[in-house]
């Protein structure tokens, strides 16, 4: 695997995404994600913003991604919807040379006004200047179901 797989994520990424869930109408969005290194720390700060085709804000989240050991990853995420996620998982290199980070929630926190979310899974795949991801979610009475997919291109280092 790359000496520091987190370094492969550093920069700003943009591209289109698609969302669906059994309780909502499918939708598309434009996304900007930024991963910023914290000097001297094995961690990246994370920010994400999505907009509609007309440029209206849809969703945002922020957090931190870090490695804990050679192939272990941890991710914490906070959303303005009142949902927080704590994830653990693995970082590995697949046969093509891409780095894959598989994460599953170990805790989902909810404010009193947040919609019910009981579990979240995230998979990130970094292959050069392309970042793809998949998000699954168990929420509002549904079991773990695919929710979001996107393919982003690096726009800055």
Sequence positions of predicted segments:
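Hydrophobic small-molecule pocket/channel-lining residues, especially in calycin-type beta-barrels
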Residues: 1-157
């Amino acid at each position: 695997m790359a000496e520091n797989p987190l370094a492969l994520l550093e920069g700003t990424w943009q591209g289109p995404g698609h969302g669906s869930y059994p309780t909502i109408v499918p939708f598309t969005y434009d996304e900007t994600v930024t991963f910023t290194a914290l000097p001297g720390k094995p961690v990246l700060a994370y920010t994400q913003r999505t907009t509609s085709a007309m440029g209206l804000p849809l969703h945002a989240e922020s957090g931190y991604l870090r490695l804990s050991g050679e192939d272990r990853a941890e991710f914490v995420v906070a959303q303005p919807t009142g949902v927080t996620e704590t994830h653990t998982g693995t970082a590995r290199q697949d046969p093509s040379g891409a780095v894959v980070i598989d994460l599953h929630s170990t805790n989902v926190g909810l404010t009193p006004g947040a919609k019910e979310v009981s579990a979240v899974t995230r998979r990130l795949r970094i292959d050069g200047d392309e970042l793809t991801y998949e998000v699954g979610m168990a929420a509002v009475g549904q079991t773990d179901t695919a929710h979001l997919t996107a393919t982003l291109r690096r726009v800055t280092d």
